Design a protein with these regions (language model features):
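Conserved catalytic-loop position in the HRD/HxD motif
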Residues: 250, 255-257
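Compositionally biased, non-globular sequence tracts
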Residues: 417-440, 447-452, 459-515
Length: 515
C-alpha cells in the first residue's frame, strides 16, 4: 500500500466525517434524506473498516440509504475473482465446482458467489477482495492516529486498548480459516430450536476463501410482516441463541447487522433463523460468563452480591468504579431491566439511555470508560437483538428464556461462584440487598393522614417530576431543601434506605424517604 493510497483512504475518511457532521446538523427532512444517501454512498465506496462502520449505521437506522449497505454494494466481476480463488485452492475452479455464478452480494472484506460442488452440494463461496488486507492496514494506521477528544479525553477512556481491540478483530476477520473454525464451533456448541448455522467445508477453506452450505431466506424487513406466530418463534430463537452462545458456548456473534440473518420456513412451516458471517465473534472466558450471570441473578433476587466485584471480574477497572460504587446496584436495575420482569418485556418502553443519565449524569462516561475494550462488541450484540425484536414487534419474557437456554444448574453454579477479591473500601461497594426497595411518600395534616404511597425505589431518580408542581415551587422557594444536592447525594451514595426530606407548608407535612 503506497503513501498515496494511504492518503486517499485518509481523504475518504475526512469526507465521511464531514458528511456525517452535515447529516447531524440537517433539520429539513428532505435534506436529511439526501445527506443520508450521500453518506451511505461514501461508506459503500470505501469497503474495509469504513464500510463496516456504515453497516453499523444500517443496524441502527432503518432508513433506505443505509439499508442498501446491508444488501451489499456493487460486487467485483467473477473474472476478477477467479484467479484469486484458483490460487487459494491450488487447482482450477472446474476441478472443484460444477458451476459458480457471479457474486450475489458484496460486503466489507469480500463477496459471496453461489456455486455447486462436483458432488452436487449447493454452496456459497466467500472470497476476500484482492488487496483488501493492505487497505485495512492503511485504515488501521489512520485509526492509530485518532486523538482522544471529548468524553474520550475527559473521562480517561483507554483509547489505545480500543485501537488494539479494533486491530486484533480486523486482523482476525481477514483470515477466513479462523472464521471457518469459529463458525464450525458455533454450529456444534449453540444448538437452539429454529436456528441454522451453515455447514462449513473445512477442506476447501483458505485464508482468503470460505466455502459453506448455501443459505436462503429473506431479510428482517420482510419477516417483520409475517404472522405473529412466526415472529414470536423468530424472536425466541434470536434471544435464546444470544443467551446460549454467551453463557454456555462462550462465543458470541458480534456482527448483528440485518444482512447477516436470513429468515425462512422449514418443510413443516416452522420459522427458521439462519445466522451468517462469523468473522466477528467475541470469545467470553468462563470467569466473565459466570460473573455476568451472577450479576443478573443477584440483581433479580436482591441478594448480598456486590455489583462492583462482578464488574471487576468482567474486566472493569475496579478503582474507577469505586468512585460510583454506591450507584452500581441501581445502575444494574436499569441495565438488566429485561431480566427482572416476570412478564413479556417491551423494548419500546426501555428508556435505557435516559435511565442511566438520570442516575449517573455525566458520570455515565466514567462508567463506560471503566469497561474493558471488548465490551462494545458484546453491547453491540445486545443492541442488535433489541433492534431485531423491535422490528419484529414482539415482546418476550427474558428470564424464563435465559433459564431455558442455560439450565438451572449453571445459574446455581454462577450464584455460588466465588468472585476474585477486590481490594477496595467496603463503603464503596454496596450489595443488592443493601439497596432500598421502596420510595415512600406521606402527607399529613394535623393528626390526619392525607396521602400515603409507595413506589419502586428507582423512582427517586425522577423525584422532581413526581412532586406536584405547586408543591415543588414552594419547596424551591423555601430554600430549605436543595433537590439538586439531594440527587447528587443519591448518585454518590446509592439508593439506600434513608430519609430524604421533611417539608412543612400550610399546615401540611410532607415526608419522603427510602426503605
Amino acid at each position: 500500500m503506497t503513501i498515496l493510497n494511504t492518503a486517499k483512504r485518509a481523504l475518504h475518511f475526512l469526507r465521511i466525517g464531514l458528511a456525517a457532521k452535515k447529516l447531524q446538523r440537517t433539520q429539513n427532512e428532505t435534506e436529511r434524506l439526501l445527506a443520508k444517501r450521500a453518506l451511505a454512498g461514501l461508506f459503500a465506496d470505501a469497503r474495509g473498516i469504513t464500510m463496516k462502520v456504515g453497516q453499523l449505521f444500517a443496524g441502527t437506522d432503518g432508513a433506505t440509504p443505509f439499508q442498501e449497505l446491508v444488501e451489499g454494494i456493487e460486487p467485483l466481476p467473477l473474472k476478477a475473482m477467479i484467479p484469486l480463488l484458483e490460487k487459494e485452492l491450488g487447482q482450477k475452479v472446474k476441478s472443484v465446482f460444477r458451476s459458480i455464478a457471479p457474486a450475489i452480494a458484496a460486503a466489507s472484506l469480500g463477496q459471496v458467489h453461489l456455486a455447486e460442488l462436483k458432488n452436487g452440494d449447493k454452496v456459497a463461496v466467500k472470497i476476500r477482495y484482492p488487496d483488501i488486507s493492505d487497505a485495512v492496514d492503511a485504515e488501521l494506521r489512520l485509526v492509530g492516529l485518532m486523538p482522544g477528544v471529548g468524553p474520550v479525553n475527559r473521562w480517561g477512556f483507554d483509547l489505545d486498548a480500543y485501537k488494539r481491540s479494533l486491530r486484533d478483530n480486523m486482523q482476525r476477520e481477514l483470515d477466513y480459516r479462523s472464521e471457518a473454525q469459529r463458525q464450525d464451533y458455533f454450529g456444534r456448541a449453540v444448538q437452539v430450536p429454529g436456528l441454522q448455522v451453515p455447514k462449513v467445508y473445512m477442506d476447501l477453506c483458505r485464508e482468503r476463501v470460505l466455502v459453506q452450505s448455501r443459505a436462503e431466506g429473506v431479510l428482517i424487513d420482510k419477516a417483520a410482516n409475517w404472522p405473529e406466530r412466526d415472529r414470536l418463534a423468530i424472536g425466541q430463537t434470536l434471544v435464546t441463541t444470544l443467551f446460549k452462545s454467551l453463557f454456555v458456548a462462550g462465543e458470541v456473534h458480534g456482527d448483528p447487522h440485518p444482512g447477516n440473518v436470513f429468515y425462512s420456513h422449514d418443510p413443516n412451516g416452522q420459522a427458521l433463523v439462519t445466522l451468517l458471517d462469523y468473522g466477528c465473534t467475541i470469545t467470553i472466558a468462563e470467569q466473565r460468563r459466570l460473573a455476568l450471570l451472577k450479576l443478573i441473578a443477584g440483581c433479580r433476587e436482591r441478594n448480598p452480591t456486590k455489583p462492583l466485584d462482578c464488574f471487576a471480574a468482567l474486566g472493569f477497572d475496579s478503582k474507577k468504579l469505586s468512585y460510583i460504587g454506591g450507584s452500581l446496584p441501581a445502575l444494574c436495575q436499569i441495565l438488566f431491566r429485561p431480566f427482572l420482569l416476570n412478564h413479556p418485556f417491551n423494548p419500546e418502553q426501555w428508556q435505557l439511555g435516559q435511565g442511566v443519565n438520570d442516575l449517573l449524569g455525566d458520570y455515565r462516561w466514567w462508567f463506560r470508560s471503566a469497561g474493558p475494550s471488548d465490551l462494545f462488541l458484546l453491547m453491540r450484540a445486545f443492541q442488535g437483538l433489541i433492534q431485531q425484536l423491535q422490528q419484529l414487534d414482539v415482546n418476550l419474557a427474558w428470564w424464563p428464556l435465559l433459564q431455558q437456554a442455560v439450565g438451572r444448574d449453571l445459574i446455581e453454579r454462577a450464584m455460588a461462584y466465588q468472585l476474585p477479591a477486590v481490594e477496595l473500601p467496603t463503603a464503596t461497594a454496596l450489595s443488592f440487598d443493601q439497596q432500598a426497595a421502596k420510595l415512600c411518600v406521606r402527607v399529613t395534616e394535623g393528626d390526619e393522614q392525607r396521602v400515603s404511597v409507595a413506589m419502586p425505589a428507582e423512582a427517586v431518580l425522577d423525584l422532581e417530576h413526581l412532586i406536584p408542581e405547586d408543591v415543588l415551587e414552594r419547596i424551591k422557594a423555601s430554600g430549605k431543601i436543595d433537590l439538586k444536592q439531594l440527587a447528587d447525594s443519591i448518585r454518590a451514595n446509592g439508593i439506600i434506605p434513608r430519609q430524604l426530606f421533611v417539608f412543612e407548608d400550610g399546615g401540611k407535612t410532607y415526608r419522603v424517604w427510602l426503605e
